[in-house]
Regions:
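Residue(s) in the substrate-gating loop at a strand-loop-helix junction
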Residues: 1
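Active-site helix of classical SDR
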Residues: 18
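C-terminal helical subdomain
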Residues: 44, 61-97
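Short, flexible catalytic-loop segment of classical short-chain dehydrogenase/reductase
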Residues: 47-57, 61-62
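Active-site-adjacent segment of SDR/Rossmann-fold oxidoreductases
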Residues: 6-7, 28-40
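Extended, polar beta-sheet/loop recognition surfaces of beta-rich domains
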Residues: 38-49, 68
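Short linear elements at protein peripheries
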Residues: 112-122
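Active-site loop-to-helix junction immediately N-terminal to the catalytic Tyr of the SDR YXXXK motif
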Residues: 7-14
Length: 122
């Protein structure tokens, strides 16, 4: 999940923390495999919103426009074939992740808090 690339997630702290763990673990394992000279690869897919039936069933609403499952898988395979470790297939999500690195943490956390709280209040 793209949550693993963000500084935290008010109102969803456990979710964001576990996703950050997965990203950290993936980076560590990739480096270990590289140093061992292994041909095995490890990747973390951090897609952001993906348009699936689950969203309708769970009544999930996203702040950013989602991508199709087919687009997500296609991008993931292409990036994995290139040796990319952390894969973010949605360009809008990728832009948000990059922006979050340059914006003060308090502002990013405030934006995430408002977004998550609005979902809780629906």
């Amino acid at each position: 999940s793209v949550a693993g690339l963000m500084p935290g997630g008010p109102y969803m702290a456990t979710y964001y923390a576990t996703k950050s763990y997965v990203v950290s673990l993936t980076n560590a394992l990739a480096e270990e495999l590289k140093r061992l000279g292994s041909h095995a690869q490890v990747h973390a897919l951090c897609p952001g919103p993906v348009n699936t039936e689950f969203n309708d069933v769970a009544n999930v609403k996203f702040s950013l426009k989602g991508i199709s499952a087919r687009e997500c898988v296609s991008h993931c395979i292409d990036e994995a074939d290139k040796g990319k470790i952390i894969i973010v297939p949605n360009m809008m999500v990728k832009a948000a992740v990059i922006a979050s690195k340059f914006v003060p943490r308090e502002i990013v956390l405030g934006i995430l808090a408002r977004s998550q709280k609005s979902k809780i209040e629906r």
